[in-house]
């Protein structure tokens, strides 16, 4: 039977070791607004990324795909201008931005990634950005204010900054082995001590005090060795802790075929580049790819993970217990950020969570849940607090994920209670007023049991309100 791996994590407001952030006002689109951010690590980082699947991609995406194979020291993010559909000049502006930042940081520009978000089609205001870079670098810090400034600087129509961090503990097989070894050594030590006493008794009976003294010296020596080992173990135990922190932006144009948004995950864990990329790719499909606000996939989407190894753990280079723990930590951070983005959907009044369980496969569960939260008819029903479950079934039906429509159960739930709506594929009589009350909560859950397997998945979205139209109609003004 496989051992259940549990994540030991505590909420943390501190950045991972070795990272610094900053955010300044460069007046890129608006005056007196934070719009340029920096992520920096003095130690070189292993990096991994996932990128938009939109065939029209911003200049920064091409830049990053070319640089991500290198060790990364810095990421510079601007808001207010997407630098998409900007041609050769847009590409040159990326190069100029990276070179200018590299000069101030005194590193090679190949170690720098870039990200942009904002209006498509406009060129970056390079004089303003170049002027702001020295200040951006000078203000980099690891304190709470730097987190606040950087997370605000990457926002566009977001109503709040989105960050989340945790401190975790690794539990590698080596640690378990050391515990077992320690126990065995203790037994052996007791046996040796017992033998030593017998030796002392025998030698005393022979009036051989020198042998007794020799045995006592050996025991003292072993005690000193034990104390030294214990001290080393304590040091190693401290090195098992690592931090992981995430910062994201996203409110509109959210329907990922990757992660429709900007996401930056920082960690001080030591891990190989190959496993870092594999972990991000896997977790991304379960988190950022499972959110939707409006069905639009951006030209600038990206999620990047940087790992600088400052935690000084033994490098994770195989799919060990430590790797599984890291994946759980990464997922915890990504789920939190994904839910924050869905909650902050433009004009949203409800966070919508769809949970599919007992599916035939993970793919089936993910596809069905994503289809439901992506349905505009479902979104508007939630906005109107209308328990129109037929729209949910309709979305499931056109999702291209086959399922047995005669088996599933459907429940609406929130902090105000829960109510069964469908049983074995057939609608049940329910109290409309109770359903309306449940759907009036700020977080609404649609729970679907397919009763056809063992797999599960979740997706997150929001309702579609009148304000969504107003916000996007006025976006360029």
State what each model feature region is.
Residues 192, 212-216:
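N-terminal polybasic/positive-inside topogenic patches
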Residues 98:
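Generic structural marker for isolated residues within well-ordered, non-membrane alpha-helices
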Residues 2-78, 82-92, 103-127, 131-175, ...:
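A structural signal for small-residue-enriched, beta-sheet-centric alpha/beta enzyme cores
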């Amino acid at each position: 039977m496989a051992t259940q791996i549990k994540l030991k994590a505590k909420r943390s407001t501190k950045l991972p070791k070795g990272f610094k952030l900053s955010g300044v006002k460069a007046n890129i689109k608006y005056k007196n607004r934070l719009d340029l951010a920096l992520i920096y690590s003095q130690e070189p980082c292993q990096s991994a990324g996932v990128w938009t699947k939109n065939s029209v991609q911003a200049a920064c995406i091409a830049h990053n795909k070319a640089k991500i194979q290198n060790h990364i020291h810095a990421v510079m993010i601007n808001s207010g201008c997407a630098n998409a559909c900007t041609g050769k000049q847009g590409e040159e502006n990326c190069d100029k931005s990276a070179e200018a930042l590299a000069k101030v940081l005194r590193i090679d520009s190949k170690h720098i990634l870039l990200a942009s978000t904002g209006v498509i089609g406009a060129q970056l205001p390079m004089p303003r950005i170049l002027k702001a870079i020295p200040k951006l670098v000078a203000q980099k810090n690891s304190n709470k204010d730097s987190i606040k400034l950087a997370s605000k600087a990457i926002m566009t129509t977001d109503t709040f900054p989105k960050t989340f961090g945790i401190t975790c503990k690794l539990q590698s097989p080596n640690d378990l082995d050391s515990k077992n070894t320690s126990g065995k050594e203790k037994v052996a030590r007791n046996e040796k001590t017992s033998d030593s006493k017998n030796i002392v008794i025998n030698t005393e009976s022979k009036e051989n005090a020198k042998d007794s003294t020799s045995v006592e010296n050996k025991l003292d020596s072993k005690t000193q060795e034990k104390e030294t080992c214990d001290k080393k173990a304590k040091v190693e135990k401290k090195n098992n802790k690592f931090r992981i922190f995430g910062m994201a932006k996203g409110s509109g144009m959210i329907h990922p075929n990757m992660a429709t948004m900007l996401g930056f995950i920082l960690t001080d864990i030591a891990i190989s580049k190959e496993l870092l990329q594999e972990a991000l790719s896997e977790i991304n499909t379960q988190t950022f790819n499972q959110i939707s606000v409006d069905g639009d996939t951006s030209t600038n989407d990206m999620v990047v993970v940087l790992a600088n190894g400052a935690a000084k753990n033994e490098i994770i280079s195989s799919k060990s217990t430590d790797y599984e723990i890291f994946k759980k930590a990464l997922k915890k951070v990504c789920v939190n950020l994904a839910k924050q983005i869905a909650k902050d959907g433009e004009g949203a009044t409800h966070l919508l969570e769809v949970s599919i369980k007992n599916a035939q496969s993970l793919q089936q569960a993910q596809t069905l849940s994503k289809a439901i939260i992506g349905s505009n008819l479902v979104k508007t029903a939630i906005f109107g607090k209308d328990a129109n479950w037929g729209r949910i079934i309709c979305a499931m039906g056109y999702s291209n994920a086959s399922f047995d429509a005669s088996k599933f159960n459907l429940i609406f739930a929130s902090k105000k209670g829960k109510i069964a709506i469908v049983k074995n594929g057939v609608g049940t009589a329910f109290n409309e007023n109770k359903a309306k009350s449940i759907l009036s909560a700020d977080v609404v859950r649609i729970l679907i049991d397919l009763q056809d397997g063992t797999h599960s998945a979740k997706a997150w979205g929001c309702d579609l309100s009148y304000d969504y139209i107003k916000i996007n109609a006025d976006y360029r003004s």
